């Protein structure tokens, strides 16, 4: 059973190949994700991952961790992209259960999510809600 304070953590190293592959698969051809020369001349100073890339890693952690308790689906997420993720970054993905609202056929679970880089800088925050189902 999911409990308030339950935490899910995962650490992931991000490579240039990861960034290019994800951007290509989702047809995001923004040169910030593909062209080192172009990206170097921008305020970012080099290649960066697209926001959905590292958000999807966080969502994958949510799904794989909390489905250990039974079926669940995401129902609402508010996301803040704060800093870029770059090739060579090692990011920590984290979810913490903050509230559980009982319903007749399950629960609505509220969670705080975050991603920090190897320097301890927060690169993404989110508040999400999932619906769990009684089995």
Feature locations, PLM:
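HotDog/MaoC-like acyl-thioester-processing domains
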Residues: 2-7, 85-135
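N-terminal hydrophobic or amphipathic segments with adjacent small-residue motifs
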Residues: 17, 39-40, 45, 82, ...
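Hydrophobic beta-strand-centered segment that forms part of the acyl-chain substrate-binding groove
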Residues: 42-46, 55-96
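Generic structural detector for well-ordered beta-strands
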Residues: 9-13, 80, 129-131
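Catalytic strand-loop segment that frames the active site of acyl-thioester-processing enzymes
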Residues: 1-49
